[in-house]
């Protein structure tokens, strides 16, 4: 679903990774040194972006529930998703987490350093922000994601 959404927004083809990002994460990080750029992109994160989006790294999470009150203290779940995202990241990647929770809504977590423009957000620990899907998707952020992912304005 998120790959189709990104395909519509950016008018470029995105596809869901058929296997887990763990193929290149954690202790498997060094595998990327013997792989082509295209091979790395096929196993990094949960979405395979267009070929020229070499700095795009995202995770997609779909869960029944999320305990929002933990965002004000410490969310082991969100911390785990951040760790998972960063485990497959290369230097200068645009790291982003798309989340959907049953009967609650869709949300986006992103690194604060990216300076996306959103109306409302929660400043989470470890340099990440948490916002709603509706607040996140605007023309400025769409252009910024496209440019950053292609290496423009790094």
Label every PLM stretch briefly.
Residues 1-154:
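Catalytic phosphate/metal-binding cores of nucleic-acid and nucleotide-processing enzymes, i.e., regions
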């Amino acid at each position: 679903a998120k790959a189709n959404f990104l395909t519509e927004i950016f008018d470029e083809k995105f596809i869901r990774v058929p296997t887990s990002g763990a193929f290149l994460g954690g202790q498997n990080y060094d595998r990327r040194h013997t792989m082509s750029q295209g091979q790395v992109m096929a196993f990094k994160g949960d979405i395979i972006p267009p070929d020229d989006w070499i700095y795009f790294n995202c995770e997609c999470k779909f869960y029944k529930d999320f305990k929002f009150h933990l965002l004000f203290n410490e969310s082991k779940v969100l911390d785990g998703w951040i760790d998972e995202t960063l485990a497959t990241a290369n230097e200068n990647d645009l790291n982003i987490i798309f989340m959907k929770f049953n009967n609650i809504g869709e949300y986006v977590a992103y690194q604060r350093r990216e300076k996306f423009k959103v109306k409302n957000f929660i400043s989470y620990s470890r340099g990440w922000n948490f916002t709603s899907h509706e607040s996140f998707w605007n023309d400025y952020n769409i252009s910024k994601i496209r440019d950053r992912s292609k290496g423009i304005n790094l």
